[in-house]
C-alpha cells in the first residue's frame, strides 16, 4: 500500500505536483491518464524515491520515503527513457541488475524473459531489438524480482497487439499476487481496458472526483 499525503513538488517556480493526497491499495491496478506535462511521470518518479518532494509525504508499507528509507524496497519501475545496455543480450541485462540488487536467481530471470515473450532472444544483443522488444525487456526487468509495487510509465508504448496482450496478462498475474500496480497512458480508453481504477492527472493535480474516476465492476 502507498499513502500519499499533501504531496507537492516544485521545480524552480513551476509546481509539477500539486497537493496530491491518495491511497493506492495492494492487489489493485491503477491507471493515470492525462496529456503531456500533466504530471504522470513525475508522480511515478516521486513514488519510486527518485525525486524528493518539496512538501508532503509518501509512506510505503509503513515507512516514509526520505525519512525512514531513501528508496522503497521491492519496487519494479519503468520510466521514460529508461536505459538498457545495448552491448549485452537480454539475459545479461537482467543478470547485471540482479547482481546490483542482490536478488533473483537465473531461473527467475529466464522466467521473466519468457513471460514477456522473449524466450527465443536470450542471447541476442539488445542493440538488435526493436523498440517494442526493448519495452518488453524493460517490463521483464520490472517484474523479475516479484516486487510488491510496480510503477510503469507507458508500459505498452511501441508494443504491437500481441505484445500488449502479453503485458496485460502479466499485470493481471501480478495483481493476483497482491502487487500494487500504477501505470500511465495518454489515453483513458487504454487505462479502462486493464485497470481497476483510472485517475486523471491535470496540471500536476490528481483529479479524484467521480467524473474522472472509473472503477471496474467486480
Curated annotation (Swiss-Prot):
Binding-site list for ATP: 34-41
Superkingdom in the source lineage: Bacteria
InterPro entries: AAA+_ATPase, ABC_transporter-like_ATP-bd, ABC_transporter-like_CS, P-loop_NTPase
Domain ABC transporter: 2-216
Keywords: ATP-binding, Nucleotide-binding, Transport
Pfam family, one: ABC_tran
Stored Gene3D superfamilies: P-loop containing nucleotide triphosphate hydrolases (3.40.50.300)
GO MF terms, alphabetically ordered: ATP binding; ATP hydrolysis activity
Similarity comment: family membership: Belongs to the ABC transporter superfamily.
Protein's name according to its UniProt entry: Uncharacterized ABC transporter ATP-binding protein YybJ
Gene designation per UniProt: yybJ
Amino acid at each position: 500500500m502507498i499513502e500519499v499525503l499533501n504531496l507537492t513538488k516544485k521545480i524552480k517556480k513551476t509546481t509539477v505536483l500539486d497537493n496530491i493526497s491518495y491511497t493506492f491499495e495492494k492487489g489493485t491496478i491503477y491507471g493515470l491518464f492525462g496529456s503531456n506535462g500533466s504530471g504522470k511521470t513525475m508522480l511515478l518518479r516521486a513514488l519510486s524515491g527518485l525525486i524528493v518532494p518539496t512538501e508532503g509525504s509518501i509512506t510505503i508499507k509503513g515507512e516514509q520515503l526520505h525519512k525512514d528509507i531513501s528508496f522503497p524496497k521491492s519496487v519494479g519501475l519503468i520510466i521514460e527513457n529508461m536505459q538498457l545496455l545495448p552491448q549485452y543480450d537480454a539475459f545479461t541485462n537482467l543478470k547485471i541488475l540482479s547482481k546490483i540488487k542482490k536478488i533473483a536467481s537465473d531461473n527467475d530471470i529466464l522466467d521473466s524473459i519468457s513471460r514477456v515473450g522473449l524466450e527465443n532472444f536470450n542471447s541476442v544483443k539488445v542493440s538488435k531489438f526493436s523498440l517494442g522488444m526493448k519495452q518488453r525487456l524493460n517490463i521483464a526487468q520490472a517484474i523479475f524480482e516479484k516486487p510488491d509495487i510496480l510503477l510503469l510509465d507507458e508500459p505498452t508504448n511501441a508494443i504491437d497487439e500481441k505484445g500488449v496482450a502479453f503485458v496485460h496478462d502479466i499485470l493481471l498475474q501480478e495483481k493476483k499476487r497482491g502487487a500494487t500496480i500504477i501505470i500511465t497512458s495518454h489515453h483513458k480508453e487504454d487505462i479502462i481496458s486493464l485497470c481497476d481504477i483510472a485517475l486523471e492527472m491535470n496540471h500536476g493535480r490528481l483529479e479524484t472526483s467521480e467524473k474522472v474516476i472509473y472503477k471496474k465492476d467486480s
